[in-house]
């Protein structure tokens, strides 16, 4: 499984500890996010989440996104990456209105500084 697909799987499972750890590993390794290969998965959700995360990480590292991300559309239904957004109205609204653009355009919702590190 490609690293971007591992990230997407952790996001889909809402396993934020694993997701943050994987992102930190890729960032510390000075990954060329623009060269991330397209996942070979047949799971449309994983493909959409992979594209969103690849674009987000590319953007945050001042790199162009991988070319394959342009071919990937949105999810069929909104997906909140934080479980608590389902029960906390203000958090849900924050995620819906301020989620990073690569995610929001694909109906993935998270807080505005999702996966940013100090």
Positions of PLM-derived features:
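Charged, helix-prone or intrinsically disordered regulatory segments positioned adjacent to compact structured domains
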Residues: 1-74
């Amino acid at each position: 499984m490609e690293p971007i697909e591992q990230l997407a799987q952790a996001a889909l499972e809402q396993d934020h500890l694993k997701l943050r750890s994987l992102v930190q590993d890729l960032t510390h390794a000075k990954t060329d996010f623009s060269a991330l290969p397209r996942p070979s998965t047949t799971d449309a959700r994983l493909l959409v989440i992979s594209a969103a995360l690849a674009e987000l990480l590319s953007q945050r590292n001042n790199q162009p996104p991988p070319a394959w991300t342009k071919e990937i559309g949105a999810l069929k239904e909104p997906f909140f990456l934080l479980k608590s957004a389902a029960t906390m109205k203000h958090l849900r609204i924050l995620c819906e209105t301020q989620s990073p653009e690569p995610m929001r355009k694909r109906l993935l919702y998270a807080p505005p500084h999702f996966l940013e590190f100090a």
